[in-house]
Amino acid sequence: INKFYVFDLTAKKSMVKYLTDQGFSVFITSWKNPGEDLSGIRFDDYLLEGVDEVVRVATEFCKVPQVHLVGYCIGGTLVTTYMAWANKHYAKDKLPVAHWTLFTTLTDLSHPGDIDVFIDEASIGALEESMAKKGYLDGSEMASSFRLLRSNSLVWNYWVNNYL
């Protein structure tokens, strides 16, 4: 889930190759799978030490005043939040992002889409309790929810092929 290499699958299926062939410099960051050691990291840390730092490094490296920023999935939610922050933090003529694009990004969190079937008070409570104990959301827990959304191909197919 949410892996950077979706933009660089093969030489013939690579947005990275396409963009570099067009003369763009491409920088990709990816989430580190969290563990207990990262339980103190908060969302604003991802904004300031993640996105804002990446934008700063990219503008310096390329010697340009602005970059184009792309967010994928939850990274797009982070980019959306970053852009709201940046528009308040930077003067309009000093904004380091010229354009931004989102792929498969949920921006209206009041309508979460198909995953809504798993969201109720009890499931949120259980998730919050688990995260309070561990200090982070284990990727396997998130992956389980996504597998259930595609149960025919990601769950039952395994059972049919291996046990029936």
What do these predicted ranges mean?
Residues 56, 60, 64, 78, ...:
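Alpha/beta-hydrolase-fold enzymes
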Residues 40-61:
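Alpha/beta-hydrolase active-site loop
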Residues 1, 18, 23-27, 57, ...:
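Beta-sheet entry/capping signal
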Residues 1-36:
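Short, surface-exposed "cap/lid" segments of acyl-processing enzymes
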Residues 71-75, 79:
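Gly/Ala-rich beta-loop-alpha elbow adjacent to hydrolase catalytic centers
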